[in-house]
């Protein structure tokens, strides 16, 4: 069995502090879009999640995890793996902002090379631990993940995406070999509706065959259903119950490898219901900040020039083509203030300068527009300024002090105090906590580990 008591030096906030740690195998399960209340208030909400509820009595848990800015998946996933904020690790949104072509979506931060700070995979690999991953974001091309089925969707056509997954899985041939036993990998074919069960089946086989000492698994069902139907809708509650069963299977597989294994369940963000969209870019077009080509019926609207544009994340970062253009900056500021003056637009606050820097995100933004719960920023270039939906959908991306954006954290296993309520914690504490349990040094983490260990 892989476990021992070890004293390691952990670099935190620029200091080298000695910690006695429980060095043992760790399985981290990330449940996308899961508010903590799916577990902490399960009984009150009529939810049957016995496997997740066990963590509250058998281990330590947070009532809420304050996330990062913006509270969307890719920056949050990188912070969970590094203990650093987006402005340090470099993953600033789900999609990049591409100033040279504003007519197409920019690339997604799929690649390990996009993360500029030390990850738990890196730290575990340096310590010669066996690492593995199924679908946790940001692993494509990593040299630190020995057995990896990454999240990578380069094509809207799943057969092409599957070819890309087979080509980028590590080591070469891993996914093809596993499919020979387990059948076709449909872990990111969201038309199948059993994507999480498929990921779990492949993760359990990796656990059984290769006995990784640090493994990450990402599950999406709660996020998918909450986006479509709203958080805590019957559909998202059903997804949470299905994931609870998968968590039980994964935990059992980890404990079958080593009864002293530690299992952590995290989420990247919560979700909030929303019914209104503010089409901020239409206001930018009307103000002359974005110039459009003449419209042609049946063809997409095209931007031909821009001075300021919107980088959306439920709220928005406002990017200037020329950051030194003070006239445009002043014009944008005045426009945003005018929009905020109308309560119907749902603007919560406008940030700039040091206020943006303090969020730890939105690097390069001239302004950040945070919205009130229930209102999101849309991407339309023409049409009405506001649009209302007949039924709520689920959204995230608000600034992390919005309690509906709270993420979740549960942990249980050898050395973890049972029944310990950690209260409200910071997402940047999770990676150094798991590094402490693994007995590895995470180079760039800037927060102290959570007090999860038994005295």
Give the ranges of each region predicted by the language model.
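Bacterial N-terminal signal peptides that target proteins for export
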Residues: 1-9
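Cleavable N-terminal signal peptides
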Residues: 11, 21-22
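A long, amphipathic alpha-helix that forms part
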Residues: 38-39, 193-210, 214-217, 222-264, ...
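Short, structured active-site-proximal loop/turn typified by the sulfatase FGly-forming signature C/S-X-P-X-R
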Residues: 40-88, 130-132
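Secreted, luminal/periplasmic, and some membrane-associated catalytic domains
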Residues: 63, 70-72, 97-113, 117, ...
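His/Asp/Glu-rich, glycine-adjacent segments
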Residues: 85-230
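Low-complexity, glycine/alanine/valine/leucine- and proline-rich hydrophobic stretches
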Residues: 382-420, 429
């Amino acid at each position: 069995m892989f476990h021992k008591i070890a004293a390691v030096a952990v670099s935190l906030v620029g200091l080298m502090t000695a910690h006695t740690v429980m060095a043992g195998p760790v399985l981290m399960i990330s449940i996308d879009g899961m508010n903590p209340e799916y577990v902490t208030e399960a009984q009150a909400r009529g939810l049957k999640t016995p496997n997740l509820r066990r963590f509250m009595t058998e281990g330590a848990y947070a009532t809420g995890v304050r996330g990062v800015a913006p509270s969307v998946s890719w920056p949050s996933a990188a912070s969970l793996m590094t203990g650093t904020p987006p402005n340090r690790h470099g993953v600033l949104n789900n999609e990049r902002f591409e100033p040279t072509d504003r007519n197409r979506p920019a690339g997604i931060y799929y690649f390990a090379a996009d993360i500029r700070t030390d990850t738990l995979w890196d730290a575990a690999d340096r310590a010669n631990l066996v690492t593995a991953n199924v679908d946790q974001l940001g692993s494509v091309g990593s040299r630190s993940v020995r057995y990896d089925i990454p999240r990578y969707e380069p094509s809207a056509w799943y057969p092409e995406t599957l070819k890309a997954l087979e080509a980028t899985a590590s080591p070469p041939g891993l996914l093809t070999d596993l499919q020979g036993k387990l059948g076709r990998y449909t872990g990111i074919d969201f038309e199948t509706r059993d994507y999480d069960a498929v990921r779990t089946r492949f993760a359990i086989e990796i656990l059984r065959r290769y006995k990784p000492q640090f493994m990450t698994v990402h599950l999406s069902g709660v996020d998918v259903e909450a986006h479509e139907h709203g958080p805590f809708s019957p559909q998202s509650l059903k997804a949470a119950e299905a994931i609870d069963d998968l968590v039980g299977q994964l935990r059992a597989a980890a404990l079958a490898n080593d009864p002293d294994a530690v299992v952590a369940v995290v989420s990247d963000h919560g979700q909030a219901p929303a019914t209104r969209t503010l089409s901020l870019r239409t206001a930018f077009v009307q103000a002359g900040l974005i110039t459009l080509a003449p419209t042609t019926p049946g063809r997409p609207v095209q931007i031909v020039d821009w001075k300021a544009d919107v980088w959306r994340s439920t709220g928005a970062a406002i990017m200037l083509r020329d950051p030194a253009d003070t006239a445009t900056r002043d014009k944008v500021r005045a426009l945003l203030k005018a929009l905020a003056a109308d309560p119907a637009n749902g603007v919560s606050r406008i940030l700039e300068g040091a206020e943006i820097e303090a969020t730890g995100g939105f690097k390069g933004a001239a302004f950040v527009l945070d919205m009130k719960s229930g209102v999101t920023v849309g991407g339309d270039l023409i049409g009405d300024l506001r649009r209302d939906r007949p039924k709520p959908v689920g959204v995230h991306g608000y600034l992390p002090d919005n309690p509906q954006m709270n993420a979740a954290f549960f942990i249980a296993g050898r050395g973890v105090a049972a029944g310990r309520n950690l209260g409200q914690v910071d997402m940047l504490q999770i990676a150094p906590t798991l590094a402490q349990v693994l007995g590895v040094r995470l180079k760039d983490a800037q927060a102290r580990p959570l007090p999860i260990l038994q005295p």
